[in-house]
């Protein structure tokens, strides 16, 4: 695998750290007036999802992580695994709860997801940026109730709970940003 010098470190670069793939989220290159230059890096381990900071000397290097991001279609959940299919090869992959994590609440049938593979096994699943889900439970909105500028909690068809405006009712389909978990709009 490729080896990266500290000068090559950029946000989004995937490297091996302690035998586990990690992605660089922030990188700051520091050249002090006296002494050797170094890179202060913030990383997120892809398997354990831990955030950590590490300092690399300018002479250090890191091995590139052999991970692949591929687009797969979400099929179904059998209770233990979430199943995805490659639309080109029709090959199916099963991701466990550790790989899916909190994103399980945004997975809907036939959604295009980005799945990160390491050693041909899924280690991370990223749902589409926006999903359209039906509201299955929320408090009824009262006409003229504009005293609070906030919203009300609504339970969606996948079990996720988001804050929605007061005018949104049960049975309506809304668009949700999966990155922040916030209401975006009603779907016409």
From Swiss-Prot:
Protein name according to UniProt: Elongation factor P
Example GO molecular function: translation elongation factor activity
Domain of life according to the entry: Bacteria
A GO biological-process term: peptide biosynthetic process
Family per similarity comment: Belongs to the elongation factor P family.
Any one cellular-component term (Gene Ontology): cytoplasm
A Pfam family per the record: Elong-fact-P_C
PTM remark: May be beta-lysylated on the epsilon-amino group of Lys-34 by the combined action of EpmA and EpmB, and then hydroxylated on the C5 position of the same residue by EpmC (if this protein is present). Lysylation is critical for the stimulatory effect of EF-P on peptide-bond formation. The lysylation moiety may extend toward the peptidyltransferase center and stabilize the terminal 3-CCA end of the tRNA. Hydroxylation of the C5 position on Lys-34 may allow additional potential stabilizing hydrogen-bond interactions with the P-tRNA.
Encoding gene (name): efp
Modified residues (N6-(3,6-diaminohexanoyl)-5-hydroxylysine): 34
Classification lineage: Bacteria, Pseudomonadati, Pseudomonadota, Gammaproteobacteria, Enterobacterales
Keyword Chaperone: no
């Amino acid at each position: 695998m490729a080896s990266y010098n500290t000068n090559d470190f950029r946000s989004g670069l995937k490297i091996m750290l302690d035998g586990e793939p990690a992605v660089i989220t922030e990188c700051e290159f520091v050249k002090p007036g006296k002494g050797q230059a170094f890179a202060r890096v913030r990383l997120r381990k892809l398997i354990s999802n831990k955030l950590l900071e590490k300092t690399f000397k300018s002479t250090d290097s890191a091995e590139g992580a052999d991970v692949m991001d591929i687009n797969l279609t979400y099929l179904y959940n059998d209770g233990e695994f979430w199943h995805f299919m490659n639309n080109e090869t029709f090959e199916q992959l099963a991701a466990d709860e550790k790989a899916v994590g909190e994103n399980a609440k945004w997975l809907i049938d036939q959604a295009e997801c980005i799945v990160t593979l390491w050693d041909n096994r899924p280690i991370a699943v990223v749902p589409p940026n926006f999903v359209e889900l039906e509201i299955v439970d929320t408090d009824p909105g009262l006409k003229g109730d504009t005293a609070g500028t906030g919203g009300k909690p609504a339970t969606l068809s996948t079990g996720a709970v988001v804050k929605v405006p007061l005018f949104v009712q049960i049975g309506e389909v809304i668009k949700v940003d999966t990155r922040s978990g916030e209401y975006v709009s009603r779907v016409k």
